[in-house]
């Protein structure tokens, strides 16, 4: 090949575009070395000139095997158009200074640039390494320099890297590789010994998580794993160029390149070594190689694992159905060759397999098809098989070798150690973090090689849910057969061979310590913190002894923890996780029967009493004292509570989940809301009569009916339209407790309770003040008894007994559950007693009505019957004042002149 002109600093530029050379995939028969299979998998390949000692990829006839490569013919013209496919896609007229160079085009533009152009690569992995994905990218070429020059080279660009790409430079006794990604303005740089006058193979790989690695003659030379931020780096061009730049302050070097190759993935160390040995010949040395240069006297044997790694990389691009993918991975795990693994191959196989598993978990159909957990458990078992094979076949000459890494699937460790090499008091995996497993040092007694495999899965727990207790070997969980379990922590695995010597008794030692930080979903956290539920946490492991993964707690005990973490002690090793079971609080059968009996009897009695109350109010409606607004409110409240309790009694015999049950749930919701709404009206009316006077009763009549019947209807319409499926679908014909629809009842009910309690306190203070004044003026001790009586009378109509329902939310508040059942179910009885049977106005009206009936039966007095008035009931003639003062009237001279008839 022809050498390039004198270069001040030999550069490899990626400025990028579209007319690359693609490599044929069929391996020629004449080239059986596995390194040529690595070369055949390249994305772009420019063989350039034939160089003695550097082998190219040939077909069966010995011809160069490339695609879309046109070797430029001899040109006599001084100028050619470079949009000719023989040159490049540049649409400019250039001067061919040297003609054909390395089967590229050596150009000199007006700006004085001396370059080899290979085309442009817009929007590709080559133009932007950040677009290569997690697989990364690899650049490879052979390079040599021809010594110093005394004359300067033609003028060229000075120190610029264009677009996202890389730069390779040799100057002043140093070689360097720089790689830049414009997307995040990151730069990686590594230095190495520059090539001399002998052909040197330079290859570098880049992966976003591993950074830059530079290999010289097949061996890792230097690296930059982290990189740094650089915002002022490069120009936005897209050409792929090998060329030179001039710096008058530096020495000038001639340089030459051969076999320029790009893989759109990062090669493994084994692949790099195989390609290098293939390129230089099975037993050949590099031509003109000095004695001090590393040589390859023997050929690396065919790596039995390389085809598996390659197939995994290729097959995962075609993954679609989880079931098919799982069977493929299981076949891979069962057909792994029983051959030794170097550290590099073991690490590569581990990373590739776990990366493949990560691709499986990202399939849109995986979540749906893995709902029964069998698919996920099969995947975990397959991973265990592969990792066990890798650890058992890992070869090492050192007493302690550990391979560690992390992927989207799991954090892993594969170790092969001699126990005497372990000096720490315990072995811990992983070494850092809140979730880990510890093995005491005294449990590792074996003097032979010990293999250790650790896996901390990142997302596997999300796919292990809805576990039926009957399908587990956790006796405590079976106590609630309908309460499903779910994984509440990371899944962590640790396998040691030969197994550690552990106590078979949980009270003995040594034992395995498993410390797991909980990873709760929003639903899990909500269920766990709900006071109506009881939370159970189990230390569990996956038992594959039966061929299928079964969760078991045998040999494990939870020794410490809370809602954030759990600590377990176990007598064995395997896959561990914390299982969570949420059990709704349930009373004993005896308490359930007692509370049900109270509810049945109380509601039945209330229905009868409320019916009697409504009949009484209807019969006495012609009496003026019963026609006032207060008794209208009592009647509406009684009717709402009556209908609600009748519907409640009917719901006890309905089948949940049916359409009639759903309709009944809607009616229950509405009528219980109306009951609370009329309790609120009772409170507001009491406030207006005792504390303030807002106006006449007639002016508030429509407002009260709007609150009592209109507001509940509006709330129900909104609730039904937004969550109709929450009605009658749980264990009873009521709103589903697990959904937000329950707040369409609880919210208004709590509001009414709070408002009425405030009103009750205010009214009680007024009554107490009047009672105190009455006692001071008249010395009547019965005034204090009237305060207690007034409170007792107001409680049923204000609904404050529902406070006990709020307090009765757990099994530790059993007394409140009984109090709520008694007071709430007997609300109708209390209304009938306090506001009908024992009410003086109602009794007086009833006596008057009785007299009217008796007079009506006598024809002699029918025509003389006069309208009844409150004055007549009180024993006073119309127009005269009563001479008998009640305790309330005795205080009329005080400042508290209020209307207490509402009480």
From Swiss-Prot:
It holds the Pfam family GPS. The record marks 573-574 as: Cleavage. One of its GO terms (molecular function) is G protein-coupled receptor activity. Residues 575-583 are annotated as: Stachel. Residues 862-903 are annotated as: Disordered. PROSITE patterns: G_PROTEIN_RECEP_F2_2, G_PROTEIN_RECEP_F2_4, GAIN_B, PTX_2. This is Adhesion G-protein coupled receptor D1. It comes from Mus musculus.
């Amino acid at each position: 090949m022809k050498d390039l002109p004198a270069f001040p600093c030999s550069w490899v530029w990626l400025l990028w575009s579209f007319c690359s050379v693609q490599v044929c995939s069929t391996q020629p028969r004449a080239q059986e070395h596995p390194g040529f299979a690595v070369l055949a998998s390249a994305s772009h390949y420019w063989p350039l000139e034939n160089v003695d000692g550097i082998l190219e990829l040939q077909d069966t006839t010995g011809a160069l095997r490339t695609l879309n490569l046109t070797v430029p013919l001899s040109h006599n013209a001084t100028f050619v158009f470079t949009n000719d496919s023989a040159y490049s896609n540049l649409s400019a007229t250039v001067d061919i200074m040297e003609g054909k160079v390395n089967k590229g085009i050596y150009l000199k533009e007006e700006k004085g640039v001396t370059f080899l152009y290979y085309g442009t690569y817009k929007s590709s992995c080559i133009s932007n390494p950040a677009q290569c994905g997690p697989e990364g990218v690899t650049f490879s070429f052979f390079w040599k320099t021809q010594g110093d020059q005394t004359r300067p080279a033609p003028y060229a660009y000075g120190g610029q890297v264009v677009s996202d790409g890389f730069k390779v430079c040799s100057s002043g006794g140093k070689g360097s590789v720089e790689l830049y990604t414009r997307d995040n303005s990151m730069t990686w740089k590594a230095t190495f010994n520059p090539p001399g006058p002998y052909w040197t193979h330079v290859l570098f790989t880049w992966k976003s998580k591993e950074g830059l690695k530079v290999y010289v003659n097949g061996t890792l030379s230097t690296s930059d794993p982290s990189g740094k931020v650089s915002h002022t780096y490069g120009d936005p061009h897209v050409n792929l160029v090998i060329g030179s730049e001039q710096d008058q302050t530096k020495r000038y070097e001639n340089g030459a390149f051969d076999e320029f190759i790009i893989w759109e993935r990062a090669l493994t160390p084994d692949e790099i070594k195989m390609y290098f040995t293939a390129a230089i010949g099975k037993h050949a040395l590099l031509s003109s190689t000095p004695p001090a240069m590393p040589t390859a006297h023997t050929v690396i044997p065919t790596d039995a694992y390389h085809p598996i790694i390659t197939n995994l990389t290729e097959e995962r691009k075609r993954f679609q159905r989880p079931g098919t993918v799982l069977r493929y991975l299981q076949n891979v795990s069962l057909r792994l060759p029983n051959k030794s693994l170097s550290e590099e191959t073991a690490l590569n196989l581990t990373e590739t397999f776990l990366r493949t598993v990560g691709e499986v978990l990202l399939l849109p159909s995986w979540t749906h098809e893995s709902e029964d957990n069998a698919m996920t458990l099969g995947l975990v078992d397959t991973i265990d098989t592969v990792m066990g094979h890798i650890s058992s076949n890992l070869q090492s000459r050192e007493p302690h070798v550990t391979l560690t890494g992390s992927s989207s699937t799991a954090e892993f460790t594969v170790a092969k150690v001699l126990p005497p090499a372990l000096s720490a008091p315990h072995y811990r995996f992983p070494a850092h973090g809140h979730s880990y497993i510890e093995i005491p040092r005294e449990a590792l007694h074996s003097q032979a090689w010990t293999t250790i495999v650790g896996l901390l899965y990142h997302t596997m727990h999300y796919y292990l849910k809805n576990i039926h207790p009957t399908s587990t070997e956790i006796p405590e969980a079976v106590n609630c057969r309908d309460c499903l379990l779910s994984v509440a922590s990371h899944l962590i695995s640790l396998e040691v061979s030969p197994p550690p010597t552990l106590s078979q008794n949980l009270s003995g030692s040594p034992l395995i310590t498993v410390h797991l930080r909980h990873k709760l979903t929003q639903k899990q956290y909500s269920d766990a913190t709900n006071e109506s539920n009881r939370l159970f946490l189990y230390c569990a492991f996956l038992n594959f002894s039966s061929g299928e993964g079964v969760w078991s707690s045998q040999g494990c005990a939870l020794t410490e923890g809370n809602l954030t973490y759990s600590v377990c002690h176990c007598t064995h090793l395997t896959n561990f996780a914390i299982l969570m079971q949420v059990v709704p609080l349930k009373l004993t059968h005896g308490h359930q029967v007692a509370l049900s009996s109270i509810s049945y009897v109380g509601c039945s009695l209330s229905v009868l009493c409320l019916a009697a109350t409504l009949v009484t109010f209807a019969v006495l409606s012609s009496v003026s004292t019963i026609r006032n607004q207060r008794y209208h409110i009592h009647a509406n409240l009684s009717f709402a509570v009556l209908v609600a309790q009748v519907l409640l009694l009917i719901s006890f015999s309905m089948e949940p989940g049916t359409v009639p049950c759903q309709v009944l749930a809607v009616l229950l919701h509405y009528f219980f809301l109306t009951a609370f709404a009329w309790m609120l009206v009772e409170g507001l009316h009491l406030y207006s009569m005792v504390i303030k006077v807002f106006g006449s009763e007639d002016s508030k009549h429509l407002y009260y009916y709007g609150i009592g019947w209109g507001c509940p209807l509006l709330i129900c319409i909104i609730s039904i339209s937004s969550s109709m499926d929450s009605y009658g679908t749980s264990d009873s014909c009521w709103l589903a407790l697990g959904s937000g629809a329950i707040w369409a009842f609880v919210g208004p009910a709590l509001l009414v309770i709070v408002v009425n309690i405030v009103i009750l306190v205010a009214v009680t203070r007024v009554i107490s003040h009047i009672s105190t004044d009455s006692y001071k003026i008249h010395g009547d001790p019965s005034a204090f008894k009237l305060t207690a009586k007034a409170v007792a009378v107001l409680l049923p109509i204000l609904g404050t007994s529902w406070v006990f329902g709020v307090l009765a939310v757990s099994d530790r508040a059993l007394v409140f559950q009984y109090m709520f059942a008694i007071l709430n179910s007997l609300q109708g009885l209390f209304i009938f007693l306090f506001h009908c049977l024992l009410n003086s106005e109602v009794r007086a009206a009833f006596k008057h009505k009785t007299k009217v009936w008796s007079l009506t039966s006598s024809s002699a007095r029918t025509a003389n019957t006069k309208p009844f008035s409150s004055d007549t009931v009180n024993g006073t003639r119309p127009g005269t004042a009563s001479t008998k003062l009640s305790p309330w009237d005795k205080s009329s001279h005080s400042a508290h002149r209020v209307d207490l008839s509402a009480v």
